[in-house]
Amino acid sequence: MNNKSIRTQILIEALPYIQQFRGAIFVIKYGGAAMKDLISKERLIADIVFLSCIGLKLVCVHGGGPEINFWLNKMNVESKFHDGIRITDELTMQVVEMVLAGKINKELVSLLNNKGVKGVGLCGKDGTILTARKAQCGSIDMGLVGEIKSVDPYLILTLLKENYIPVIASVGADETGKTYNINADFVAGEIAASLGAEKLILVTNTSGILADVSQPESLIRDTNIMQLRQLLSRGIISKGMIPKVNCSIRSLAQGVRAVHIIDGTKPHSLLLEVLTNNGIGTRFLYKQSILLQLNCFSFSNVSI
C-alpha cells in the first residue's frame, strides 16, 4: 500500500468517530509529568486544535507538579509530602497558584491561540466553577490541600457554546475565599461529570494500565469498574495511578461514558486514541449493572 492509500485509509477510519463525536464534550486532563517535553506539548496542542476544528467541545484541565517543585526549589522552599500528597502551607499555596494559574495556564492558552483556536485561561475560582473545602487526610494536617465540594459548570458551558476552549488550573476556593490546592485528576473528573461529558481523557507519561508493570506490551486496552476494583485489590494498580483510577471510577459512576489514560509523550496520542479503531491507551467503560456507590472512593488517596 503506497503512502497516498495509507493516508486515505486513515481518514476513512477516522470518519465514523468524527461523525459520532461532533458536538460532544471531552474533558482532557493534561498532567504535569507529561508537560516536560516541549515537542510532546506542541503535538498535544495540535491534536486539541484538530479535534476542536472537527466540531468537538473541549475542556482542558491541567496540573503542574514538576513545575511547582522547580519554582519552590528556586525560592529555597522545601517541598514536603505525606503519602504522596503535597503539604501546602500559605507560602507553598502562593507558589502553586502562581505557577498553575499564572504561568502554565497562560502558556497553554497562548499555544492554543497561536494555532487559531480560542483558548480561555481559568482556575476553579473563576465564576465559582469549583467550591472547595479542606481535604480530610487522616490525622495529618496537610494545610491548604483541598477537595471539591461542588462544581458549577455554567461558565464552562457558556464558553463552549461560543466555541472557546476553557483551560482550567486546579486551584479552587471555599465560600470564604480561602484558596486550596486540589488534585488535577479529581478536578477534571468532577468537571467532566458536571458537564455530562462523553469522555474524560487523562494525558500522562505512561501508556495506561499494565497487567504486568515490567511488560510494556501487557497494556490493558479495555476495562470496566468491576475489573478496576479487582486490579486495585490485587495491587496491580499502585502509586500515582491509584488517584487516576479512583477519579475515573467516580466519573463513570456519575455518568461520564468513557475514561481514557494515554501517554502524552507519544506522537499524536490523543488523535490515535479518539479517532482510530485500536486506540493507544487504556479505556474504562461505564457498565450500569456494576455501578458503584461514590462513597467507596476517598479523596484522601490523592497525589498533588
UniProtKB/Swiss-Prot annotation:
Keywords: Amino-acid biosynthesis, Arginine biosynthesis, ATP-binding, Chloroplast, Kinase, Nucleotide-binding, Plastid, Transferase. One of its GO terms (cellular component) is chloroplast. Transmembrane segments: none annotated. The keyword Plastid applies. Its EC number is 2.7.2.8. The record marks 29, 244 as: Transition state stabilizer. It is an enzyme of class 2 (transferase). Its main location: plastid. Substrate binds at residues 64-65, 86, 181. It holds the Pfam family AA_kinase. Signal peptide: none annotated. It is found in: Plastid, Chloroplast. Pathway: Amino-acid biosynthesis; L-arginine biosynthesis; N(2)-acetyl-L-ornithine from L-glutamate: step 2/4. It catalyses: N-acetyl-L-glutamate + ATP = N-acetyl-L-glutamyl 5-phosphate + ADP. GO terms for molecular function: acetylglutamate kinase activity; ATP binding. GO terms for biological process: arginine biosynthetic process via ornithine; L-arginine biosynthetic process. Belongs to the acetylglutamate kinase family. ArgB subfamily. Catalyzes the ATP-dependent phosphorylation of N-acetyl-L-glutamate. PANTHER family: N-ACETYLGLUTAMATE SYNTHASE (PTHR23342), N-ACETYLGLUTAMATE SYNTHASE, MITOCHONDRIAL (PTHR23342:SF0). This is Acetylglutamate kinase. It comes from Cyanidium caldarium.
